Amino acid sequence: MTALSKSKEIIDQTSHYGANNYHPLPIVISEALGAWVKDPEGNEYMDMLSAYSAVNQGHRHPKIIQALKDQADKITLTSRAFHNDQLGPFYEKTAKLTGKEMILPMNTGAEAVESAVKAARRWAYEVKGVADNQAEIIACVGNFHGRTMLAVSLSSEEEYKRGFGPMLPGIKLIPYGDVEALRQAITPNTAAFLFEPIQGEAGIVIPPEGFLQEAAAICKEENVLFIADEIQTGLGRTGKTFACDWDGIVPDMYILGKALGGGVFPISCIAADREILGVFNPGSHGSTFGGNPLACAVSIASLEVLEDEKLADRSLELGEYFKSELESIDSPVIKEVRGRGLFIGVELTEAARPYCERLKEEGLLCKETHDTVIRFAPPLIISKEDLDWAIEKIKHVLRNA
């Protein structure tokens, strides 16, 4: 076997044994550091996806990796049958970051969404007084909250639902950004309005100005929980600690994941006050790995990196520069550039995938979303020099469309 065949061998092996539920670009990543990755042949590429914003702190950040190693040498898993010495510090760190009184830890973003809806439903029955089994959740058209049965039931994408029915009941969808539709959808049985402050998978869609403030006010007036899915937008990605900060709103509940584990270990959580998360009692919810000491130690280090290195400020500054450079590109295929911080979408007049493939050939890795949008979301630790390198590659590909 020659070195040149290694990537193809791995891709063939993956295709042969793996379920065909992904369509990745034809590249194998075998090593990474900071904003750069390598394939088995030693070719370097810039990562402009950050594992869908899970790698905000950069690949293999030394502080996070050290926390992983140190904790792995002590204990990795206890289950929640016993206390562990990392869970309390993780709770306190995350509670102070979010300004909430209680934290419930899980592993993946989709699990955290499930936990949020379970909490909202039980809150509706025990606190709001909704009749049993009548609680409703309102979500938005174009949302993405994961791939579990709840998440696909929340989705408006038929392809996500096809062949997986029946969907879960008690869900209503409104157009993203439509205040009147939200007002009309609320009934006495409404438990929560679940939203993304910026819709990522829909193509980096920013809500109309004033929508989130008005939605928050309506939910407060109607005694409906206002729940923000900040799994992808939170923790510095948009140039603020949370994307909700752009609109000056504080949700009743945050859903966090991805960068909470620094791109090193899966951990997610929901954060809310005692009135909401206090509805859980022993046995009502759980996870064997949720809140495990390894994940908690990694998460504490990941949050410290975000704070100590002021990555939200860095995202804001570099994001404004990056967006302005993208807007200056004279290309017949660019329809719109939108985004906040280092969370930017370039909408094209045609399919985006061929352009992602061309950018890969130029040494830059990104991914299409919603068919016609190229999503650019590099690690927040990226240097301006590296960003300038990427900008030149993007200009070259889009100008020569």
Curated annotation (Swiss-Prot):
Q: Which residues carry this modification: N6-(pyridoxal phosphate)lysine?
A: K258
Q: Which reaction does it catalyse?
A: a 2-oxocarboxylate + L-ornithine = L-glutamate 5-semialdehyde + an L-alpha-amino acid
The lineage's top-level taxon is Bacteria
Q: Which Pfam families match?
A: Aminotran_3
User: What class does this enzyme belong to in the EC scheme?
Assistant: transferase
Where in or outside the cell it occurs: the entry states: Cytoplasm
User: What is expression of this protein induced or repressed by?
Assistant: Part of the rocDEF operon. Expression is sigma L dependent, induced by arginine, ornithine, ctirulline or proline. Ammonium and glutamine strongly repress induction of the rocD by proline, and only glutamine represses weakly induction by arginine.
- EC number per UniProt: 2.6.1.13
> What GO terms in the biological process aspect are recorded for it?
arginine metabolic process; L-proline biosynthetic process
Identify the cofactor(s). Answer: pyridoxal 5'-phosphate
* GO cellular component terms, semicolon-separated: cytoplasm
Enumerate the GO terms in the molecular function aspect: identical protein binding; ornithine aminotransferase activity; pyridoxal phosphate binding
Pathway per the UniProt entry: Amino-acid biosynthesis; L-proline biosynthesis; L-glutamate 5-semialdehyde from L-ornithine: step 1/1
Any phenotype upon disruption?
A: Cells lacking this gene do not grow in minimal medium containing either arginine or ornithine as sole nitrogen source.
**CDD domains recorded:** OAT_like
Keywords recorded for this protein, A-Z? Amino-acid biosynthesis, Aminotransferase, Arginine metabolism, Cytoplasm, Proline biosynthesis, Pyridoxal phosphate, Transferase
InterPro entries from the xrefs? Aminotrans_3, Aminotrans_3_PPA_site, Class-III_PLP-dep_AT, Orn_aminotrans, Ornith_aminotrans_bact, PyrdxlP-dep_Trfase, PyrdxlP-dep_Trfase_major, PyrdxlP-dep_Trfase_small
The entry's function note states: Catalyzes the interconversion of ornithine to glutamate semialdehyde.
Q: Which family does it belong to?
A: Belongs to the class-III pyridoxal-phosphate-dependent aminotransferase family. OAT subfamily.
Which HAMAP family does the UniProt record give?
Answer: Ornith_aminotrans_3
Name of the protein in its database record: Ornithine aminotransferase
Q: Which organism is it from?
A: Bacillus subtilis (strain 168)
Q: What is the lineage of its organism?
A: Bacteria, Bacillati, Bacillota, Bacilli, Bacillales
